[in-house]
Amino acid sequence: MEQRSQRTAAGTAVPGANRRRLWGPVIGFGLVSLAADIVSDGARPLAGPLLAQLGASALVVGLVTGAAEAAAQGLRLLFGPWADRTRRYWTFTLAGYGLTAVCVPLLALAPLAGEAGLVLASVLIIGDRVGKAIRSPAKTVLLAAVTKQVGRGRGFAVHKSLDLLGAVLGPVLIAAVLAATGSMSVAFAVLALPAAAAMFMLFWLRLRVPSSVPAAVDALPPPGADRPATVFTRGFLLFAVAAFFWSAGLVAFGVIAFHLTTTAGVPVAVVPLLYAGAMAAAALGALASGVIYDRSGAAALLALPLLIAAVPPLALAPAAGLAFAGVLVWGTATGIQDSTVKALIADLVPEGRQGTAYGVFAAFEGAGALAGGGLYGSLYSSRPLLILAVAVLQLIAFSVLVVALFRIREPQRGRSARTLRQD
């Protein structure tokens, strides 16, 4: 029986039946993310080629995709504290997924909109990422609650792996539609089907999960819940500063896709398949770093700046083979960033402040993404200088991260065997 049990955050053994019950909500959120990522990540590799088709330059592509990522991250500073104050975590989660479900299929209209097509596409691309900003802090609080008993490193990694499975299936679906029709409009329109499926599953999950979510999430706001300053420990802020620098160096995939189709000679229909490969690499990176995090702590994140520094010399190389390798490195880096980083924040911050913490942290990442979009767009034609700039940014990120890891009172090894610290 011991082989069929696992340990909860309190350190007690969980029988197989209870294990399935504890993992059920985690898998449920993962399936919602799977369907939603078929939509969002199915469209994402076409952002650069679509904007280029509509007349955008490398600078415009960099700014639009950078602004989209900045919105996805930076606006969480608004929606994270808002979710904490109101405790309406489900409302924000539903609204955010709904915005993505609307914006992405409407990209089908952009090539048909004439001179307004570039503006329409830019607004919808950014709108999709605004939806992510609305839902992400609230959804992550819900996910942090349901992963507490199964180990946050593993829980977030399993959820992220399902999420990334959708990010693989979406581009494969888009590639198949492009191969069959040659039309980006048809490809975007097809994504209305998984969008509807994601919303159906989310409403179904809403009816079943409340009993699995700790009272701390659904309770009325405690006194002083509108004061996020309690999450601003020195270690947390240093960690966020490191995130600014690594985000500034992590190129948006729209720029990579622009490069692949305009410089490396890769057909547009192949780009979604390359993105699918990147998401497979991201899933492996998320799982590996999650397991290492649970066993060895936050030092697992030191690999992130090193991976990011390797992206531009590979992904923006003129040779397609090197560019393909760079896409895989890019995917691995995003997998670590999107899963293990969140697990650490959940362990650093009390439950009543996690929405605020995710929002504040994401604001640093968003500011970095916006700066990075401008950096890549303006230096795209001077790649040696771009490679040097990214290397310097990642050296700074690595150094600040090392200091942050010393400042943070190291979250205890084996987070799956501990409760949150209530600093």
Locate the predicted segments by residue.
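Helix-loop boundary and gating motifs at the non-cytosolic
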Residues: 16-70, 236-267, 271-274
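Helix-to-loop junctions at the C-terminal end of transmembrane segments
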Residues: 75-88, 178, 284-297, 380
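C-terminal ends and interior cores of transmembrane alpha-helices
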Residues: 98-115, 306-318
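Cytoplasmic helix-loop-helix junction between adjacent transmembrane helices
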Residues: 124-165
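C-terminal transmembrane helical hairpin of 12-TM major facilitator-type secondary transporters
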Residues: 296-341
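Symmetry-related core transmembrane helices of the 12-TM Major Facilitator Superfamily/SLC fold
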Residues: 186-204, 387-404
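Cytoplasmic membrane-interface "Motif A"-like loop-to-helix N-cap segments
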Residues: 85-98, 294-305
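Juxtamembrane intracellular "pre-TM" segments in multi-pass secondary transporters
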Residues: 2-23, 207-242, 417-423
